[in-house]
Amino acid sequence: MTRDTIPLAGVIGDPISHSLSPRLHGHWLRRYGLQGHYVPLHVNHANLETVLRTLPLMGFVGVNVTLPHKEHVLSIADSVTDRAALIGAANTLTFTANEQIQADNTDGMGFLSNIRQALPGWSASAGPALVLGSGGAAKAIVSALVSDGAPVVHVANRTRARADGLKEQFGARVSPSDWTHIPDLIGDAALIVNTTSLGMAGQSPLSLDLSRLSPPTVVTDIVYAPLQTNLLRDASIRGCETVDGLGMLLHQAVPGFERWFNYTPTVDEDLREAVLAG
């Protein structure tokens, strides 16, 4: 295999130095003995389209996309999957042999796969879901929960208008709520998801009244630094099943790796340890 035929992939963002994706994909490439490279690419908004059109000419087969470019890449892509169009953002770009850009969003799939790996047999159809926050991650997760059969998805946000926007975007099974109503919704929820940055290292804590929280409610947090947030710790103390946020990052990476390197990787404890090792 010549240098020209070794597939190249990467992750684009601004900033990008914090990304765990190079560690993740690098582990898979080494583990499976595959030819390929995965690199971080610091690209600002002004240069985004030029870079994306140039990368296929340099041998790149695709890239992951992180903040702040996940929405803007949709206007650059030549084709967009239905789920990426519905969510309004893409995190995975694939470059075709004729240098076309295909955009997809695998965040929702990664979210569901993370819970199912931790809790085999789990389904969103088990009961109402409560999603905290209404940003980009929330949109992908709400879309996935609705598609997976959640009877109702309550979305609580400090700015009510943003929660209302998700109902307009994803339909009648989405129920917007004020942040102050969270304690009333917790008792009936089969699933509680924190999609905000509250509770992340360096951010303000997530302070909730969990007095009505009890099994069999499942609680998950997309934050993975720390792995056990205060929300997950307190839910565990109350006897609830909890799922940390690292697995969502790992599972959302599977489709891109499969397309770019023609191999289906496994998400397991070895991968978790490699990504967390630093």
Curated annotation (Swiss-Prot):
The active site is at K70. Its EC number is 1.1.1.25. Keywords: Amino-acid biosynthesis, Aromatic amino acid biosynthesis, NADP, Oxidoreductase. The keyword Glycoprotein does not apply. Shikimate binds at S19, L20, S21, T66, N91, D107, Y224. Belongs to the shikimate dehydrogenase family. This is Shikimate dehydrogenase (NADP(+)). It comes from Jannaschia sp. (strain CCS1). The gene is aroE.
